[in-house]
């Protein structure tokens, strides 16, 4: 459920993933700029990272325990002025801006960059690639098969 707007500075977002109430911290999506967030310098339009936990899950078949990383919270930072420029000046601006958000959201849940320029997870991006490619979808599918972590 969305919690609404916050004035919390991105630099002060805590690495703590559980609050006093035992709930996982919400994902923070920040519209910011390179002055406030230096990691958005040059042509970096966004970045994201998930807060990862290691959980142990027993195998349903042989009882062995596997250690798995799961993502429970995190942050997405988007360069508002650069996104506005994409929207205003690119013929395919809306699709390109949405592609940036998709790319960063995929990082949030655990996807990494790939070398294939036809995939949305390529770090260089392309005005021609505005949706997840087959490799992106395979990665998301694999992540979706992982274990869930309870609230408390």
List the predicted regions and their residue ranges.
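Metzincin-family zinc-dependent endopeptidase catalytic domain
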Residues: 1-102
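Active-site recognition of the HExxH zinc-binding catalytic motif
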Residues: 99-111
């Amino acid at each position: 459920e969305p919690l609404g707007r916050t004035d919390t500075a991105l630099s002060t977002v805590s690495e703590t993933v559980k609050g006093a109430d035992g709930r996982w911290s919400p994902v923070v999506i920040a519209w910011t700029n390179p002055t406030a967030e230096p990691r958005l310098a040059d042509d970096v339009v966004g970045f994201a990272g998930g807060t990862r936990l290691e959980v142990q899950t027993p195998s349903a078949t042989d009882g062995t325990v596997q250690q798995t990383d799961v993502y429970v919270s995190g942050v997405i930072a988007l360069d508002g002025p650069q996104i506005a420029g994409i929207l205003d000046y690119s013929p395919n601006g809306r699709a390109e801006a949405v592609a940036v958000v998709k790319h960063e959201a995929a990082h949030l849940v655990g996807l990494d960059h790939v070398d294939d320029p036809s995939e949305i997870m390529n770090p260089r991006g392309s005005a021609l690639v505005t949706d997840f490619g087959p490799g992106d979808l395979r990665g998301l599918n694999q992540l979706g098969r992982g274990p869930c972590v309870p609230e408390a």
